[in-house]
């Protein structure tokens, strides 16, 4: 079945085009859209992503876990995040950025930390990177209203630097509780900061892609590039489509397992 007109528009918004045979009425739904070639030659659709299941990731217990965060309901959790002073990042923030979306969503997307726009508006992924994430979601048949989006860090680091380990450790119980309350069926890790935090590794992001990991031996996780990186390296967008296909595969298997 060929992609719908809506999905083709979304792929174009990502800066991608999909090659299809002119004389064919059907197309492989697993085909990976590619960046347009400089010579205008069509690109053959890639094979479906190979599923490689990685061992479950043991999640570390931080000192902040003992303050009762692990028992909070959504309203109390969001209130505690908004008033958090656990690390120095609160001193320069306009506001904390807990997360946004459906609090019963199957899909959870985890980024790194708020930027200037997010700090001002109190919502993750609202700048140019957020616009690209919206296009990526639409290309996958999703919307911001259907997923839950959060960051590993809830306050903006100065000059948009990467979060420090101490800051991440203080914020991590909040993220753990968000996952526990949400109970997602699939988690997509956006960028190396989120991947390193959730997988407890320092491997290059390219080596972490193409595998299905397990959060607490339950929830499948897939690694992909951060939208901000894609704005600087648009040639990597097609790989994000591959990662989304892998996430869809993991979600289907998870749903079948729970049926």
Which ranges hold each PLM region?
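A polyanion-binding, active-site-adjacent surface
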Residues: 2-259
């Amino acid at each position: 079945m060929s992609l719908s007109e809506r999905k083709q528009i979304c792929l174009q918004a990502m800066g991608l085009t999909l090659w299809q045979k002119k004389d064919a009425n059907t197309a492989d739904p697993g085909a990976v859209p590619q960046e347009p070639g400089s010579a205008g030659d069509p690109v053959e659709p890639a094979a479906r992503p190979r599923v490689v299941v990685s061992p479950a990731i043991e999640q570390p217990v931080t000192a902040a876990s003992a303050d009762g965060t692990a028992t909070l309901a959504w309203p109390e959790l969001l209130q505690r995040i908004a008033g958090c002073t656990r690390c120095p990042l609160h001193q320069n923030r306009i506001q904390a950025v807990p997360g946004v979306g459906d609090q019963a969503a199957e899909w959870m997307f985890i980024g790194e930390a708020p930027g200037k726009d997010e700090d001002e508006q109190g919502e993750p992924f609202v700048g140019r990177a957020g616009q690209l994430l919206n296009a990526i979601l639409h290309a996958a048949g999703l919307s911001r209203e259907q997923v839950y989006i959060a960051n590993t860090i809830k306050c903006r680091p100065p000059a948009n630097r990467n979060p420090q380990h101490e800051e991440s450790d203080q914020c991590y119980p909040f993220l753990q509780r968000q996952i526990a309350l949400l109970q997602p069926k699939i988690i997509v890790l956006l960028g190396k900061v989120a991947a390193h935090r959730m997988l407890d590794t320092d491997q290059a992001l390219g080596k972490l892609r193409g595998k299905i990991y397990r959060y607490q031996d339950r929830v499948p996780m897939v690694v992909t590039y951060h939208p901000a990186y894609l704005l600087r390296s648009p040639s990597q967008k097609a790989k994000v489509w591959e990662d989304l296909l892998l996430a869809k595969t993991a979600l289907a298997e998870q749903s079948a397992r729970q049926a």
